[in-house]
Swiss-Prot record:
Protein's UniProt name: tRNA dimethylallyltransferase 2
Family of the protein in this entry: Belongs to the IPP transferase family.
Transferase in keyword set: yes
The species this protein was found in: Syntrophus aciditrophicus (strain SB)
EC number: 2.5.1.75
Region (Interaction with substrate tRNA): 40-43
Quaternary structure note: Monomer.
Cofactor(s) it depends on: Mg(2+)
UniProt keyword annotations, A-Z: ATP-binding, Magnesium, Nucleotide-binding, Transferase, tRNA processing
């Protein structure tokens, strides 16, 4: 079968933050002369390097990376934008005969590329006003508590600060009587534009938490606080969505005098652990993922090699 007819083959490396996805993807890419597509909702932003744990300049020189540093923090970007750009890159790499490795921890972005986005029912303005009223009256915690009581599966993968997704999940549940998570899972099987091998990385909770601790301390040593200060000086204000992201929100809190540094760091570590738990919940619902310990490089290479050879 010719390359122009055969569906592109994608190796997708996924898992929680700090587990070692970047190193694994680079090892795979170097083994077969492949290129990497970053599926990370924060690494798309310029000037946000340390807090997003972007591959280093040296790593990006060793293996070509795509969809890193493509928009400014004050530009709108979402899963639909990512899907469009990623699919264009995949088409180009496939045309050039390159092996394609997708790596990241943003489950929604990965799902969008592999199977498209679930549109769901049209927005209901009356319902949205209802939930915005609840948000104004009871705050994010009240809205999240309502979601958790009505749709625990959605609450397990939606961040308690992500009011947009919380309201959409409640709206879909009201309109259809079915969890948005269940509908998304059904939708992902409808589109199969690629042949995909899903590799998941995970380790014990204690080891992962140690990695998160070390990653946080390393970020601070690399100048994370200065990075956030520079972003504010450049005019990227704290209300921007990327500036509300994990890590940046805590550092802004310190710079504004709302938190002392120890409080900010402790909060960052705690929230990162919670984020990792949500990532594992999201990926754990996908039966197509084969899981490996991060250190099992040779086993991962053999598994990926069989896929690339069509075995």
């Amino acid at each position: 079968m010719t390359g122009s007819i055969e569906k592109p083959r994608l190796i997708v490396v996924m898992g929680p933050t700090a587990v070692g996805k970047t190193a694994a993807a680079i090892r795979l890419a170097k083994q077969w002369g492949g290129e990497i597509i970053s599926a990370d909702s924060m690494q798309v932003y310029r000037h946000m390097d340390i807090g997003t744990a972007k591959p280093t300049p040296d790593q990006q020189c060793r293996v070509p990376h795509h969809l890193i540093d493509i928009v400014n923090p004050d530009e709108s970007f979402n899963a639909a934008c990512f899907m469009e750009r990623a699919r264009a890159v995949i088409a180009e790499l496939h045309k050039r005969g390159k092996k394609i490795i997708v790596v990241g921890g943003t489950g929604l972005y990965i799902r969008a590329v592999l199977g498209g986005l679930f549109d769901g029912p049209a927005a209901d303005e009356a319902l949205r006003r209802h939930y915005f009223t609840i948000l104004e009256r009871e705050g994010k915690a009240g809205l999240y508590g309502m979601l958790k009581a009505r749709d625990r599966r959605a609450a397990a993968i939606i961040h308690p600060n992500d009011t947009t997704r919380m309201i959409r999940a409640l709206e879909v549940l009201d309109l259809t009587g079915v969890s948005i998570v269940e509908q998304q899972q059904e939708h992902r099987f409808a589109q199969r534009p690629y042949r995909v091998l899903k590799i998941g990385l995970r380790c014990s909770r204690s080891v992962l938490y140690e990695r998160i601790e070390a990653r946080t301390e390393e970020m601070l040593a690399q100048g994370f606080l200065d990075e956030v200060r520079q972003l504010l000086d450049m005019g990227f204000h704290e209300g921007l969505r990327p500036m509300q992201a994990l890590g940046y929100r805590q550092m802004v809190g310190f710079l504004k005098g709302e938190l002392d540094l120890d409080e900010a760091v402790d909060q960052l570590k705690r929230e990162t652990r919670r984020y990792a738990k949500r990532q594992l919940t999201w990926f754990g619902a996908d039966p197509e993922i084969r899981w490996f310990e991060p250190g099992n490089e040779e086993e991962i290479l053999r598994y990926a090699g069989r896929f690339l050879r069509g075995e």
